[in-house]
Amino acid sequence: MKNIYKDTLLIGQTDFDMRAGLKDKEPVIQEMWDAKKIYDQKQKLNEGKPLFMLHDGPPYANGDLHIGHALNKTLKDMIIRWKNANGYLAPFIMGWDTHGLPIETAVTKMGIDRKQTPAVEFRDMCKDYALKQVANQANQFKRLGIFSNSDVKYVTLTHDFEVSELRLFQKMYEKEMVYKALKPIYWSPSSESALAESEIEYKDVKSPTIFVAMKVVEGNAKIDTDTEIVIWTTTPWTIPSNQMAAVGENIEYNIVKANDRKFILASSLVNKVAEQIGWETFEILDTLKGPEIVGVKYAHPLYEQKINPVVIGHHVTDEAGTGIVHTAGGFGEDDYIIVKQHGIEPFAPIDDQGKFTNEIAEFDEKLVGVFYEDANKIVGMDLEAKQRLLKLKFVSHSYPHDWRTKKPVIYRCTSQWFIGLDKAKNQILANVDQITTKPEWAKKRLYQVLEDRTDWTISRQRLWGVPIVAFYDQNDKLVLNNEILAFAIDKIAELGTNAWFDKPADTFLPEAYRNKNLKKEKDILDVWFDSGSSAIALSERFKNLPLPYDLYLEGNDQYRGWFNASMINSTIYSGKSPYKKLISHGMTVDEKGNKMSKSLGNGIDPIEFANTQGADILRLWVASTDYTDDQKIGPEIIKQIGESYRKIRNTMRFILANLFDFDPSKDYQTNLTEVDRYALNNLSVVKNKASEAYDNLSYNQVYNLVVNYVTKDLSSFYLDFIKDILYIEKNDSIRRRQVQTVLYEQLWMLIDLLRPILIHTIEEVYQAMVNLNKTDSVHLLDNKKQDFIESNEFVTKWNNIMVLRDDVNKALEIAREQKIINKGFEATVKVCLKDEFKNIESTTELEKIFIVNSLSFTNDCSGLSEQKIAFVGVELKNGTKCERCWGIFDTLINNEICERCNSVVESL
């Protein structure tokens, strides 16, 4: 092309880079947001609008963020941004969970001995460590672009939060729902503390299982003293604590002769037990019911001087074992209930570290100080020596573990604080019935977990946490009432929780209870009680944030955790659910579906990712996933996301470049051609669908709609054919301004739909827009109303034109293969429409839309190839190519350019 004509083309221009450079640009954009306080500005702008409150579940303040944190916070961030741009005041108050064992452990790893360090000094170290972790994580969330003010947050260690939590404890106590009792609970020797059900996870382990024969010493009319009762257990270490044997009231039992010994076991299990123990032959001597065995006494299998009874057990079945249950009241919930029913105190000679105490010395001195797991071997050898061991076998089975230390836990009878749920259970379940959930099955799951939940163990034997406010006399008898509790909590509100650990008990007691040598409780509240109080603490701190909140969104591991604790606490506190809607998301896994772990080397550090590839790419990945299921992420998936990002970015760059001379205040056109109206109709359809998907929190639908729109509606259609108009037409021609008007609306549509996702890129787009009266940030704007929906008749016609376009393109492809033409603009196209599509013939600009030289309609279909809605023929246009627009014409001015181009050139 001659330079003179090249220079007359209106080639687009923009400062918006083709290369993203997100790792460098994003921090700069974030600094601008911080400097101009964009989040605070938006909250101010939205004052008076309806409140939308998403309550942020607090991540634990220990260590750097992982990919699961990024997924969770990005999902929340997209919700908040969408709501703020669509008529709501939607604050994002982030929270942190800051008490508990992991922080204590982190401090002790710094060389601090918890037991040798003064309590307040140790607690201050924990606080300092936790606050550093909060600051670190807050900065990392900022790098991911979270729309919040990190100065306005909630942290469970702050004074106001701790006092709010204690007021909740007080309210529960006043409702007579808090009690202290000796009960078997989950105990973690590795963390030396009680655990709640929500802190338990199950893992497969190999354990010894044993069949034990216990000799009858006091029989009855049916059972002689030469008979032996057979029990089976997976915890041999509990045999020293055996207090009873339990039989089922409606279970049938046999007396069986095998190897010249007589054994009692459930009839239905005889064959199975015989096979497991290795009885080659056996004989059924008698049959009897469970109650006929009750009252029989047997010698303890290890300590023959200890005589124990046979009793009825409500929990006994004949589905496994022997149908007779070894009962140790100190190490099992059902066992505890049974021994208490018979007036016997549970025997639990295991200390906080899982070692046998001196209580066992009366029977077996060698066990004192032995770790419970190590006792399995000792017990097995002793049973074998006494000929009480019938069979030992190792089996794999699911066993409870401490969710923090990942080590096994035991059931252990200790004195703990509990919240009794009986009074509130019906209201809790009624509240669950009222919420909506995503996925739908989530409601049933939460309901089941709460329905099955037993009383909540809320005490922990640690230092770093909120103290349980209670007192004891010199005989360790509990001294507590409403007056004492109210006074003590008021005093803590004045002095802070640290005071509880270093000031005398009298400081916290009403005058009438002082000088009585009372002692303070040493236990602290469960961290789930902390985080489960967060909705209440927030509603008390911000009076304009009443319960219930609109939304809770966390991982699907929180049904037994935060979802659960929050529902219990809020119901007891206010009678209400803390949330109207609950959403759970899956876990992040690698591309093969494997859980991410350091050992597999398949983890993805979100901050490292943001600093190399950009937070916007990570956010686009989040939007692309069905988050209700586990989300896969890895190199191939990220590559696909990167390709989608480039399509989106290049499309917006093209639009920006071709709006360089468009001033919407002067050049915006309302009288548009049919194809422009069709493009705007499609824009509105997609935006409406995507907006509905946003409202339904279905971000993968938004992602698919936008990527499909960019690829098909824009790149493959509208943006393709308008290049001729944009580049060739006179700069201020009506037709060019019409097309630019459509581009302007298309850009705003992409801005609105991508603003919650590609937060940095859309800011960059906005700042690159010209001839616009701009505000500080795109994130201060509300979504633009874009209602361009056309009639069904109009849309049907244009949908058919798109089908005709496909028909023409197929014919052009055949013509290219047959060497009739090289390019579409060389083609003369003849179309014979099928009868029901004749209304297309009146449409103008079709040759431009189809990017051909000319297009004509005929009623003579002969010689044309049949396609979907038309018969199409293609011929080569004979003529000369215009040096400016490349169109083929019969004649050119000066043998160089066409009349249209000449008129444009002459006007320059």
From Swiss-Prot:
The keyword Iron-sulfur does not apply. GO terms for molecular function: aminoacyl-tRNA deacylase activity; ATP binding; isoleucine-tRNA ligase activity; tRNA binding; zinc ion binding. GO terms for cellular component: cytosol. Keywords: Aminoacyl-tRNA synthetase, ATP-binding, Cytoplasm, Ligase, Metal-binding, Nucleotide-binding, Protein biosynthesis, Zinc. Its EC number is 6.1.1.5. Its cofactor is Zn(2+). InterPro entries: aa-tRNA-synth_I_CS, aa-tRNA-synth_Ia, Anticodon_Ile_BEm, Ile-tRNA-ligase, Ile-tRNA-ligase_type1, Ile-tRNA_ligase, M/V/L/I-tRNA-synth_anticd-bd, Rossmann-like_a/b/a_fold. A motif ('KMSKS' region) lies at residues 595-599. It is found in: Cytoplasm. ATP binds at K598. It catalyses: tRNA(Ile) + L-isoleucine + ATP = L-isoleucyl-tRNA(Ile) + AMP + diphosphate. L-isoleucyl-5'-AMP binds at E554. GO terms for biological process: isoleucyl-tRNA aminoacylation. The keyword Metal-binding applies. Gene3D superfamilies: 1.10.730.20, HUPs (3.40.50.620), Ile-tRNA synthetase CP2 domain-like (1.10.10.830). Zn(2+) binds at C882, C885, C898, C901. A motif ('HIGH' region) lies at residues 59-69. Binds 1 zinc ion per subunit. Belongs to the class-I aminoacyl-tRNA synthetase family. IleS type 1 subfamily. Catalyzes the attachment of isoleucine to tRNA(Ile). As IleRS can inadvertently accommodate and process structurally similar amino acids such as valine, to avoid such errors it has two additional distinct tRNA(Ile)-dependent editing activities. One activity is designated as 'pretransfer' editing and involves the hydrolysis of activated Val-AMP. The other activity is designated 'posttransfer' editing and involves deacylation of mischarged Val-tRNA(Ile). IleRS has two distinct active sites: one for aminoacylation and one for editing. The misactivated valine is translocated from the active site to the editing site, which sterically excludes the correctly activated isoleucine. The single editing site contains two valyl binding pockets, one specific for each substrate (Val-AMP or Val-tRNA(Ile)). Monomer. This is Isoleucine--tRNA ligase. It comes from Mesoplasma florum (strain ATCC 33453 / NBRC 100688 / NCTC 11704 / L1) (Acholeplasma florum). The gene is ileS.
